[in-house]
Structure formats: structure tokens, C-alpha cells
């Protein structure tokens, strides 16, 4: 009887772990049926993606809200939170970082690097 309870408990823990991993995963993009809206044809629109986004959007402009699930800020801007901390990228696992797109107050110039999901599009 003890073996059965231990086995059942182990199965429940494994199932819970798998469900948590799937909840943090992005669904694959189906480009055969996907219909993306065209982006504006101007220099102000820098194509970027949300963490699980399949279609490009214009990157965040100055004073736009930014966090781990929004499209990244324009390459000339950084995401600044209420304490003044700057991030060029807010990664999907940084759940507590929320801010607005602003010009950097630091003297260091950021060099833009494509996110992993941006190079695959």
C-alpha cells in the first residue's frame, strides 16, 4: 500500500512539473494560416516581436509601457522602471520588471542584438 501511495504522489509531482513547463512555453507559429498585418512603411517603425509573438509589430516608442510580455522598446530606447533601472531587453522570465521606454541616462551605448525569436522570422 505504501508503494502505491508513493508512486501516485511521484506521478502527480511529475504531471504538475510538465504542466508548469507547458504553461511557460510558446506555441509554434503556423505560417501557413497566419495573416500578419503589414507594418507602416516609415523609418519610425522598427520591426520587433512580443516574446511569443508570430507577427512583427512596431517596437515601443518613447513613454510606451514595457514589461516581459510587451514588444521591446525601439533600439534607441531602453525600458526604465520606477526606480530608474534600465534594461535594453526585458526577458520573458522577468515577471516583476515593468517600466516605460525612455532614452538611456547612462553614458554607455547599447549595441542592438536581435532576440533569438527575431532572427527566426
Curated annotation (Swiss-Prot):
UniProt entry keywords in alphabetical sequence: Disulfide bond, Glycoprotein, Secreted, Signal
Lineage per the UniProt record: Eukaryota, Metazoa, Spiralia, Lophotrochozoa, Mollusca
Disulfide bonds: 26-52, 29-54, 36-55, 45-58, 66-79, 73-101
Provenance organism: Lottia gigantea (Giant owl limpet)
Annotated protein name in UniProt: Perlustrin-like protein
UniProt GO cellular component terms: extracellular region
Chief localisation class: secreted
Tissue spec: Component of the acid-insoluble organic matrix of calcified layers of the shell (at protein level).
Subcellular location: Secreted
Residues of the signal peptide: 1-23
Record has Signal as a keyword: yes
